[in-house]
């Protein structure tokens, strides 16, 4: 695997000329059009734009989670400063190699906490599994770490939440469990795709404060996706504005 030079020593993610399209009934729709940007260690970058502007498709491309077909990455590179592989283009990695990066080096929090957790497993077991797989912890070590994470994300009565099924806790608590899961392996990059949209305003503010605190404490880079400039302004150092699949504006907050 050839070594790749990133544009800056602090750069941990470099997206270059990314083009993604969807093919449906023979018709091609371009969702991401020649997008390029860098993410630096520990910084918070907001990606803002209206629905359909390509924000989530860009995020899913970074995670290599787009289903093909109908999605197709036409061109571009996504370079990651990986703990395991060195500087690598994630689009060239096998599914097996990607499994060691997802959750471990790049983690993602999705918009809808109600559907992000598996309803048939207890909340604690869902976090615990990630620790056993990626951090090679014993069951006891993973449980203790999970309870510690639940405390860190300010879940009340961590032991009770650990043994609860997702339907037994509130939407805000579900999202805190998802944040604990995402942060469990101390990833270099956390992608949050509209993580507060499904929550009420008070819970939304608490989740934003929590994520900002975790980012600073863990020195994790945050990519925060939203259609709401007010929310982005709360957490981002820098903003990328997307429109019709392109980055049309970029600036500091």
Specify the residue positions occupied by each region the protein language model found.
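Helical segment within the ABC ATPase nucleotide-binding domain
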Residues: 205-219
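ABC ATPase "signature
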Residues: 250-251
